[in-house]
Amino acid sequence: MRIGHGYDVHRFCDGDFITLGGVRIPHKYGLLAHSDGDVLLHALSDALLGAAALGDIGKHFPDTDPQFKGADSRALLRHVVGIVRAKGWKVGNVDATIVAQAPKMAPHIETMRQLIAEDLQVELDQVNVKATTTEKLGFTGREEGIAVHSVALLLPA
């Protein structure tokens, strides 16, 4: 069994929605990114890649490569799952914590879990997503961006 940790941050920019866990959420800002900016799926991808000793998403999907401009992070996550499986691993479970002052995540978490489970090809009870604030402290508390911490457990396939 292997455990991986993922962490990602994206800064807010002009826009009127963000995408987290594959869910489009109305917001007063967007997220600045080369891809679609789905910080949750990026952190999960990094956790999976880390657990399999396969580097990180920057190695597999460099932000200097034009083919990944505006990329759908769900497609990137599915690709990560494919290469992790090719190395002989399957997902045991994943857990993620979204750190954001706004927008409120609670109304969207179940849909995020369902989409992530679909992309990972696992059962819903193998995926956990939760959210917290920093009580208005730090960059997330000042609503400058969003951060996500995640862990993944891989089991031999």
Swiss-Prot record:
Gene giving rise to this polypeptide: ispF
Binding site for 4-CDP-2-C-methyl-D-erythritol 2-phosphate: 8-10, 34-35, 56-58, 61-65, 100-106, 132-135, 139, 142
Classification via Pfam families: YgbB
The protein's annotated pathway: Isoprenoid biosynthesis; isopentenyl diphosphate biosynthesis via DXP pathway; isopentenyl diphosphate from 1-deoxy-D-xylulose 5-phosphate: step 4/6
Site positions for Transition state stabilizer: 34, 133
SUPFAM superfamilies: IpsF-like
Top-level taxon of origin: Bacteria
Protein name listed in UniProt: 2-C-methyl-D-erythritol 2,4-cyclodiphosphate synthase
Family: Belongs to the IspF family.
InterPro entries given in the database record: MECDP_synthase, MECDP_synthase_CS, MECDP_synthase_sf
Gene3D superfamilies linked to this entry: 2-C-methyl-D-erythritol 2,4-cyclodiphosphate synthase (3.30.1330.50)
Cofactor mode of binding and number, as noted: Binds 1 divalent metal cation per subunit.
Subunit comment: Homotrimer.
UniProt function note: Involved in the biosynthesis of isopentenyl diphosphate (IPP) and dimethylallyl diphosphate (DMAPP), two major building blocks of isoprenoid compounds. Catalyzes the conversion of 4-diphosphocytidyl-2-C-methyl-D-erythritol 2-phosphate (CDP-ME2P) to 2-C-methyl-D-erythritol 2,4-cyclodiphosphate (ME-CPP) with a corresponding release of cytidine 5-monophosphate (CMP).
Catalytic activity reported: 4-CDP-2-C-methyl-D-erythritol 2-phosphate = 2-C-methyl-D-erythritol 2,4-cyclic diphosphate + CMP
Keywords, sorted A to Z: Isoprene biosynthesis, Lyase, Metal-binding
Species: Pseudomonas putida (strain GB-1)
